[in-house]
Amino acid sequence: MATQILLCFFLFFSVTLSSSGHPKNFSVELIHRDSPLSPIYNPQITVTDRLNAAFLRSVSRSRRFNHQLSQTDLQSGLIGADGEFFMSITIGTPPIKVFAIADTGSDLTWVQCKPCQQCYKENGPIFDKKKSSTYKSEPCDSRNCQALSSTERGCDESNNICKYRYSYGDQSFSKGDVATETVSIDSASGSPVSFPGTVFGCGYNNGGTFDETGSGIIGLGGGHLSLISQLGSSISKKFSYCLSHKSATTNGTSVINLGTNSIPSSLSKDSGVVSTPLVDKEPLTYYYLTLEAISVGKKKIPYTGSSYNPNDDGILSETSGNIIIDSGTTLTLLEAGFFDKFSSAVEESVTGAKRVSDPQGLLSHCFKSGSAEIGLPEITVHFTGADVRLSPINAFVKLSEDMVCLSMVPTTEVAIYGNFAQMDFLVGYDLETRTVSFQHMDCSANL
């Protein structure tokens, strides 16, 4: 069976909400778009077609990152409004359940709101701000309004209401009011956790390619207006996730752990936990690590890619933070010059198969066997202070019974450490100490 997709989202926290009465540990359930539990699941689509669609989304997402890193006009960089996971939250008083796309590449959460000027078809109820006793518009001079970029915010001066506007590269868009509201998250234990005064976008003018099963976007990036950034002290600025390669085609769901006890423990010598620093860079939405080298078997290849941070002359500078870790991107994208050396080492190390072309033309290095079993090399990723040894499912994807492809591709833009490379790891984020930890784990046992 072909290797399955499981993408997840990051959560990033800072203090903006009161943590009084909130648990220090809880879990949130996510439903993958390709899971049989997903509202957009189509049993007629083959596993191979699902994989190819995910690969194409990886390319689109990397372009979006590149635009946001290299342009000041963020609207031109928002490419694609689809996502890999749906997340359920409730909003307002009385509460209305909304089912929205979880997106690590966005900060402000927005949902469709009545009264609509233009709203796309939605299967569930649309949030009506007039029926909620806890809805409150944000004034134009508020800190939360000013946290939006100049291209994303506006002002209704006659009513002193802050406005947001998001325009995506696939012609999707959302416009509306910035407001605060009570948001509740259904934890995996079954008990909802409520956060009053959460900043969000109340979208009354929305259209494009949004799926009718979703109410909007849940912003899970690292910026100040991210839903998760607003929860900060409520979960001690710690979270972890475990991505299982099985859950995209089973009735299992993905669970992200939030709070003090969510981080991999390194107290035991046999824990296998390794940690690497998070690098602080703009824009805050993304999570930057420093990649030093990748080993293929015993051959260690120094990473030659620059961090995508052009200086005033448009020249890339050799600094730390040269790769973004992102669970919303399926593939791993590596600097083209380095990739040539790395992929050559992989090709030399594969046994029992010959190199062939990917039938879809999406992956650069595929290998096909006759009747023999394909021998794949061990690959180790060397981040600063952390050597992460990958399993075959982390570096290769099985497209058929006799063909596998390297799930890493070259790029001339921003490097991304993608979802496949993170499967069956407990990946922990300690945003107080600014570290990311990795620990091998059977994630299917933790769903």
Swiss-Prot record:
UniProt entry keywords in alphabetical sequence: Aspartyl protease, Glycoprotein, Hydrolase, Protease, Repeat, Secreted, Signal
Domain Peptidase A1: 85-439
GO cellular component term of the entry, any: extracellular region
Gene Ontology terms describing biological process: pollen tube guidance; proteolysis
GO MF term list: aspartic-type endopeptidase activity; endopeptidase activity
Glycosylation sites: N25, N251
Top-level enzyme category: hydrolase
Gene3D superfamilies: Acid Proteases
Coiled coil: none
Pfam families recorded: TAXi_C (PF14541), TAXi_N (PF14543)
Compartment(s): Secreted
Matching PROSITE patterns: ASP_PROTEASE, PEPTIDASE_A1
Cleavable signal peptide: 1-20
Effect of loss of the gene: No visible phenotype.
Keyword rRNA-binding: no
Catalytic machinery residues: D103, D326
EC number in record: 3.4.-.-
Family classification: Belongs to the peptidase A1 family.
Record's protein name: Probable aspartic protease At2g35615
Source species: Arabidopsis thaliana
Lineage of the organism: Eukaryota, Viridiplantae, Streptophyta, Embryophyta, Tracheophyta
